[in-house]
Amino acid sequence: MEDFVRQCFNPMIVELAEKAMKEYGENPKIETNKFAAICTHLEVCFMYSDFHFIDERGESIIVESGDPNALLKHRFEIIEGRDRTMAWTVVNSICNTTGVEKPKFLPDLYDYKENRFIEIGVTRREVHIYYLEKANKIKSEKTHIHIFSFTGEEMATKADYTLDEESRARIKTRLFTIRQEMASRGLWDSFVSPREAKRQLKKDLKSQEPCAGLPTKVSHRTSPALKTLEPMWMDSNRTAALRASFLKCQKK
């Protein structure tokens, strides 16, 4: 599973996931299912915010150009992917500026158009069950919840899905593709079932060819959202080294 994750996701997402796990004392090489889940969640958060801006009239617009108009403002503030100290600094700044209620738990995004924090969920189970778990944990009507599944289902607070249908379809397609890639390599069952995961871990530890037989379909285009985060945690030399290592692995 670890090798699959490194092949399937953008190297910068993988690096962020590793940093997040190590911050909590977790090992990506051992807790590989969690590693995959964190990478998936990060990618969904970045895809959620990609290309969405607010124009000078306060209207939400979609711009896919690499050099948007200077008058445009990013619609979403990305909180997920930052270390806890920086994340809370961002949250406190938003609350002080906008007057919104400070959440008890770190949310994933802030929507400047709707003036609300957003909690993103990606589940391998029924969306309504995971939604209720999130709602019971957060216990706040101020934080908007949006849940996606690997089967194309979604659920959001008051059926308000925030994004346009096409943007949500991109996320659903990506999740479905991840599921299909896992299933084709016998990894999906272990991703869903903890018991199967233990068996798969033993199998993974015996593997001698980390790059063999793994998918190579990964986007080399850096997400606009990732570009805004990159200066905070990675310089250009580290980025180049990661990408060089990734391409070398592909050629084997």
UniProtKB/Swiss-Prot annotation:
Keywords, comma-separated and alphabetical: Decay of host mRNAs by virus, Eukaryotic host gene expression shutoff by virus, Host cytoplasm, Host gene expression shutoff by virus, Host mRNA suppression by virus, Host nucleus, Host-virus interaction
Pfam families the UniProt entry points to: Flu_PA
Signal peptide residue numbers: none
Keyword Hydrolase part of the UniProt annotation: no
InterPro entries from the UniProt entry: PA/PA-X, PA/PA-X_sf
Transmembrane regions: none
Domain commentary: The probable endonuclease active site in the N-terminus and the basic amino acid cluster in the C-terminus are important for the shutoff activity. The C-terminus acts as a nuclear localization signal. The C-terminus is recruited to host protein complexes involved in nuclear Pol II RNA processing.
Described purpose of this protein according to its UniProt entry: Plays a major role in the shutoff of the host protein expression by cleaving mRNAs probably via an endonuclease activity. This host shutoff allows the virus to escape from the host antiviral response. Hijacks host RNA splicing machinery to selectively target host RNAs containing introns for destruction. This may explain the preferential degradation of RNAs that have undergone co- or post-transcriptional processing.
Protein name (record): Protein PA-X
Species for this entry: Influenza A virus (strain A/Swine/Hong Kong/126/1982 H3N2)
